[in-house]
């Protein structure tokens, strides 16, 4: 079954917040046992959207899904207990996330469209290195993650382009049976903290046939404090046939190493 977001009230003008329309389509598809949520060609601004069981978010060619940079529109991270504590902010747990899912299964993002994080509205070149243009740009705005998927079993991201993330691009935490295939991540090569793909305390992950260009780490396998407390080890991560470009590390294991990798 397919659910077109235009039928749920979305407006393709790049200015109207379509979060309610997109979330309604996702909720309806999941409640019906699963389905494909279609984002047709056009520009769609949105606040945070939570994907759910058995839902595929499909971006048609020419579709651009735009992350809001307004804190009011963005869901925060869970706090306290085994969640995010105040002393975890050094691990990058700030500002919430745009697209995500939590404790879900059979979630897919696919299609030939683009997810745009508006990082080019966040990173400013103040020429602090006197014209060498090598140091990270200054950050002067609210910066949500583009994606955070936590404890998702059978998670796939295929073919889409992820562009200009304001913070980490694709963060997977405690996920199992993951395939990231054929995607492009095109971020500012001087953007701070705009990691490409971050498997965090995940198991059984395949990252294949991807092009990733970032200012921070292109692919980094890690174990952050909150996710290590929840999910333990990070293991069975396969990376193959990818083209990686970074001003930091193209491929890194660690930095956040609170548990076993």
Predicted features, each with a name:
Residues 1-261:
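Extracellular/periplasmic carbohydrate-active domains that bind, remodel
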């Amino acid at each position: 079954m397919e659910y077109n977001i235009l039928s749920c009230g979305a407006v393709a003008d790049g200015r109207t917040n379509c979060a309610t329309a997109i979330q309604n389509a996702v909720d309806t598809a999941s409640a019906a046992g699963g389905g494909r949520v279609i984002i047709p060609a056009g520009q769609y601004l949105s606040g945070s959207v939570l994907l759910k069981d058995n839902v595929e978010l499909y971006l048609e060619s020419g579709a651009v899904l735009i992350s809001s940079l307004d804190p009011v529109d963005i869901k925060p991270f869970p706090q306290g207990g085994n969640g995010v504590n105040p002393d975890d902010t050094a691990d990058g747990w700030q500002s919430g996330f745009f697209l995500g899912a939590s404790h879900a299964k059979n979630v897919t993002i696919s299609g030939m469209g683009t997810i745009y994080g508006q990082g080019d509205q966040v990173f400013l070149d103040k020429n602090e290195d006197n014209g060498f243009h090598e140091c990270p740009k200054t950050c002067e705005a609210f910066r949500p993650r583009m994606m955070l998927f936590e404890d998702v079993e059978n998670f796939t991201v295929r073919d889409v382009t992820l562009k200009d993330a304001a913070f980490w691009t694709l963060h997977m935490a405690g996920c199992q049976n993951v395939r990231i295939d054929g995607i492009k991540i095109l971020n500012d090569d001087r953007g701070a903290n705009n990691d490409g793909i971050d498997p965090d305390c995940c198991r059984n992950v395949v990252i294949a046939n991807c092009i990733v260009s970032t200012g921070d780490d292109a692919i980094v396998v890690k174990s952050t404090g909150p996710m290590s407390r929840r999910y333990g080890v990070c293991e069975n991560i396969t990376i193959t046939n990818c083209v990686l470009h970074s001003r930091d590390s193209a491929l890194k294991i660690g930095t956040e190493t609170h548990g076993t990798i």
